[in-house]
Amino acid sequence: MYFPFLGRLSITDYIIVVLVYIESIISSVLKLIPQPMINLFEWLINFSTSSDDNTIEEKLRSAPTIHEMCAIFDISVEDHLVRTEDNYILTLHRIPPISKNRFNNKVVYLHHGLLMCSDVWCCNIERHKNLPFVLHDLGYDVWMGNNRGNKYSTAHLNKPPKSNKFWDFSIDEFAFFDIPNSIEFILDITKVDKVICIGFSQGSAQMFAAFSLSEKLNRKVSHFIAIAPAMTPKGLHNRIVDTLAKSSPGFMYLFFGRKIVLPSAVIWQRTLHPTLFNLCIDIANKILFNWKSFNILPRQKIASYAKLYSTTSVKSIVHWFQILRSQKFQMFEESDNMLNSLTRPYQIANFPTRTNIKIPILLIYGGIDSLVDIDVMKKNLPFNSVFDVKVDNYEHLDLIWGKDADTLVIAKVLRFIEFFNPGNVSVKTNQLLPSASLVEELPSTTWKTTHPTHGLSYRTHSADRSPLSVQADEADEVHNADNSRFLRRVFSTSAIDEDNENEHQDDTEDQIHKEQQRRLSAYLESSKDLRQLDANSSTTALDALNKE
């Protein structure tokens, strides 16, 4: 075995290596402990915190499944089982519309990040900071996915979870099977034409990969919101861990085996006191990613950190390490040779995200998130359909559990969905417009945008005969064909032949996109405050948004 970095390690680095081995030994020992003894430790921990049983954070922490978590907020959840094309059985969690009268005919599909499950969407201690609940209040049909191998999806028709074969999957399988098969199932049940997709962290990467591999899937998604999107992370904060991440896959398998990564974490969740467990998580996040978690309240950590880990394969972690090493969003490389990039007679295929995705995309990223390289990411996505929002002083996990996630993230998600509502495209101008109901909420009584190249003006007056009045100069009608072609290219469901594109047209499209980005940014900044929503309030998110 080749160890390229041992001669460069500091004392601290050696300590980390030793701790990794100690964890492996402890993990092996824990497997020998009888289940009744583990249950006893868990009971002792729960007993020691019994004085706080009535707090919302303790109720969420101790809730064993998403059903109990949502029940705390008087929301019911359905289980749906999806059989993938390679015979894994996945669990989808659905929060159905309140009633047919409240259903807005829109379906949203949310997908979690690495080492997570659907629980992470529903563990905010304040109701209005749980994105699925806000969408539910607004009349959406909400679905939450789960990757193969996590706590809700550990079944296969002929591969037992104890076998190595069950855990032989990477991001490739998530993209080829889990995401598209889940979306197909949702469409079949709900009978709608398209879904709105929202991904967090690796969930975003899985969706980017899935959309890039299937033109058919592009036709079935209307919007995509990527929260804390991961694609080609810069690297890990700690030198030794970053070196390990970029080493041979065989070296990683030597550390962690070929099944579940860090299987002992589940036992630590159950047997450590919440205060100690949360401290361990904060220290690990600081070492690995330099995250300080100042935007997540201590009470919130009690609820959220208990839901932070769910099982996945070592191979999927190795896949991320290969991406870190190559700095390319590529498919998994099976070769075990550390120097194969110099000797292999082939190239590893990259996910064709820049050319094959035809969906409006919003990137919401933290300004101090060490895992997101937004400039590299935007270069790997279609320039004319991607918009981005930076949340200053926010890290990775802050975007779903931060104290201001409602106003800084959720409200902008809602605005983006409405801004790019397919029903808001003017037939006359072929320009995308915000929905009429939401334009009325803008601070000024008149909202005007003049197109930089075509002189198209859009005005909204409260006294007009309709909430939204679009006026276009007749002299600019000759440009509509160009606008129409551009919008078809961005939002079409089939490939458009662009072989005859000239430089002038590319410049025009770039200007159009910049104007759309400017309009969208201003629109997102008009988001209402959703703070008045809480677990005991009957006020819905819709009421809050419409309230002056």
UniProtKB/Swiss-Prot annotation:
Principal location class: other
PTM summary from the entry reads: Not N-glycosylated.
Membrane protein topology class: Single-pass membrane protein
Output the Gene Ontology cellular-component terms: lipid droplet; membrane
The UniProt GO MF terms for this protein read:
sterol ester esterase activity
Entry-annotated residues carrying N-acetylmethionine:
M1
Q: Where is the composition biased (Basic and acidic residues)?
A: 502-516
Catalyzed chemical reaction(s): a sterol ester + H2O = a sterol + a fatty acid + H(+)
Which stretches of this protein does UniProt put in the Cytoplasmic compartment? Answer: 35-548
Q: Which residues carry this modification: Phosphoserine?
A: S462, S466, S521, S538
Kindly report, in one word, the top-level EC class recorded for this enzyme.
Answer: hydrolase
> Per the Swiss-Prot or TrEMBL record, what residue ranges does the short sequence motif GXSXG cover?
199-203
Query: Is Ligase one of the keywords?
Result: no
Q: Where are the transmembrane segments?
A: 14-34
Question: May I ask which residue range the UniProt record assigns to the signal sequence?
Answer: none
Which residue range or ranges hold the AB hydrolase-1 domain? 107-402
* Chain residue ranges for the region called Disordered: 449-477, 496-516, 528-548
What Enzyme Commission number(s) appear in the record? 3.1.1.13
Q: How does activity depend on pH?
A: Optimum pH is 7.4.
Q: Which family does it belong to?
A: Belongs to the AB hydrolase superfamily.
Q: What is this protein called?
A: Sterol esterase TGL1
The opening ranks of the lineage are: Eukaryota, Fungi, Dikarya, Ascomycota, Saccharomycotina
